[in-house]
């Protein structure tokens, strides 16, 4: 009998850093400030990476892309996701599907949702759904100080 599918959960949060490029769901949003971070600050992709790693029992992005390691400084979320997928394949897993929800007031994801889903699906080699919500003025994201994202991923052993 083959191993049952495995589910992983990922979460990330970053504050905005004025003047920094805004990368979110793998896309550049040029009219918005980006998020602070060692890499590109893309909370959605980081949450996806954590969800995929968690599902396959491979730790988290903090362990894989250590902040003190200069190889990962300013690395793109797309490159991180590619690296995670390759790691998964080496360990005998593949992603079945994933979902990510961005939490924040800006930038608006809706107008670029299809573009984001296509990009993330290509990177993960599996269907990815993208959603967004706000916290109705509550907390860091509600005050417009940053963004967070939560993601799930389903993987199977191949």
Swiss-Prot record:
GN (gene name): ispF
Name of one Pfam family that matches: YgbB
Catalyses which reaction(s): 4-CDP-2-C-methyl-D-erythritol 2-phosphate = 2-C-methyl-D-erythritol 2,4-cyclic diphosphate + CMP
Flavoprotein in keyword set: no
Organism classification: Bacteria, Bacillati, Actinomycetota, Actinomycetes, Mycobacteriales
Cofactor detail note: Binds 1 divalent metal cation per subunit.
Described purpose of this protein according to its UniProt entry: Involved in the biosynthesis of isopentenyl diphosphate (IPP) and dimethylallyl diphosphate (DMAPP), two major building blocks of isoprenoid compounds. Catalyzes the conversion of 4-diphosphocytidyl-2-C-methyl-D-erythritol 2-phosphate (CDP-ME2P) to 2-C-methyl-D-erythritol 2,4-cyclodiphosphate (ME-CPP) with a corresponding release of cytidine 5-monophosphate (CMP).
Organism the protein comes from: Mycobacterium leprae (strain TN)
Keywords: Isoprene biosynthesis, Lyase, Metal-binding
EC number: 4.6.1.12
Entry protein name: 2-C-methyl-D-erythritol 2,4-cyclodiphosphate synthase
NCBIfam families in alphabetical order: ispF
Lineage: superkingdom: Bacteria
Keyword Transmembrane helix: no
Co-factor(s): a divalent metal cation
GO molecular function, one term: metal ion binding
Site entry: Transition state stabilizer: 38, 134
């Amino acid at each position: 009998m083959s191993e049952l599918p495995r589910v992983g959960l990922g979460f990330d949060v970053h504050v905005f850093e004025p003047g920094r490029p805004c990368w979110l769901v793998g896309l550049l949003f040029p009219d918005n400030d980006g998020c602070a971070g060692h890499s590109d600050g893309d909370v959605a992709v980081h949450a996806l990476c954590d969800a995929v790693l968690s599902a396959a029992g491979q730790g988290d992005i903090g362990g894989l892309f250590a902040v003190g390691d200069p190889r990962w400084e300013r690395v793109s979320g797309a490159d991180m996701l590619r690296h995670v997928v390759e790691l998964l394949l080496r360990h005998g897993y593949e992603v079945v599907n994933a979902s990510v929800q961005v939490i924040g007031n800006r930038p608006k994801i809706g107008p670029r949702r299809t573009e984001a889903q296509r990009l993330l699906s290509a990177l993960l080699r599996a269907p990815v759904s993208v959603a967004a919500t706000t916290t109705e003025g509550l907390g860091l994201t509600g005050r417009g100080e940053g963004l967070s994202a939560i993601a799930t991923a389903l993987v199977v052993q191949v």
